[in-house]
């Protein structure tokens, strides 16, 4: 599986939905030895028994997240995970927009990589492509989670920036595969 950001700040939502699923997949592969050897900064917007997310962005960010939903809830290793992201794009997202993604297992950094949002949307054949015009977006993506995801707590930190290096989106995703 290629390390394509599917949680990436939602090229206009498709890439965020995709990044959320892929981040879990990446973490499982990195730790499990697989082929690739998760509101405005005041707390979790959504909390389940095994996952939560924090919209750490500002009201002035180009992308405003409304919700992230997963099915099945909680995510199950070895099964498909469908992620639906809703949000508003406040300003046009142009070529050159990028996100920095960090995947951690506890305090251990497993992956830190920068992704070009528009390139990733093209490679993923996403329904939303650059330039992304302002407006509301809902995107659903399905990814296969690896069976070998270890029983551990993962965090996926996403920081997105416009072509002008202005804040675009900020998302922290936390997934706990220790719970049953």
Curated annotation (Swiss-Prot):
The keyword Signal applies. One of its GO terms (biological process) is intracellular sterol transport. It holds the Pfam family E1_DerP2_DerF2. Residues 21-43 form a propeptide. It comes from the Eukaryota. Residues 1-20 form the signal peptide. GO terms for molecular function: sterol binding. SUPFAM superfamilies: E set domains. Keywords: Lipid transport, Signal, Transport. Catalyzes the intermembrane transfer of phosphatidylglycerol and phosphatidylinositol. Monomer. Belongs to the NPC2 family. This is Phosphatidylglycerol/phosphatidylinositol transfer protein. It comes from Cryptococcus neoformans var. neoformans serotype D (strain JEC21 / ATCC MYA-565) (Filobasidiella neoformans).
């Amino acid at each position: 599986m290629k390390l394509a950001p599917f949680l990436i700040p939602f090229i206009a939502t498709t890439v965020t939905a995709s990044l959320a699923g892929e981040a879990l997949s990446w973490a499982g592969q990195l730790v499990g030895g697989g082929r690739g050897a998760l509101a405005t900064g005041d707390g979790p917007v959504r909390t389940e028994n095994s996952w939560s997310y924090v919209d750490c962005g500002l009201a002035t960010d180009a992308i405003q997240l409304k919700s992230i939903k997963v099915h099945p809830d909680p995510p199950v290793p070895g099964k498909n995970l469908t992620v639906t992201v809703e949000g508003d794009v406040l300003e046009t997202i142009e070529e050159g927009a990028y996100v920095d993604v960090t995947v951690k297992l506890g305090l251990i950094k497993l992956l830190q990589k920068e992704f070009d949002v528009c390139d990733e949307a093209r490679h993923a054949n996403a329904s939303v492509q650059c330039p992304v015009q302002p407006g509301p977006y809902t995107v659903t993506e399905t990814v296969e989670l690896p069976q070998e995801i270890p029983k551990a707590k993962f965090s996926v930190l996403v920081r997105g920036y416009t072509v002008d290096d202005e804040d675009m989106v900020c998302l922290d995703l936390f997934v706990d595969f220790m719970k049953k």
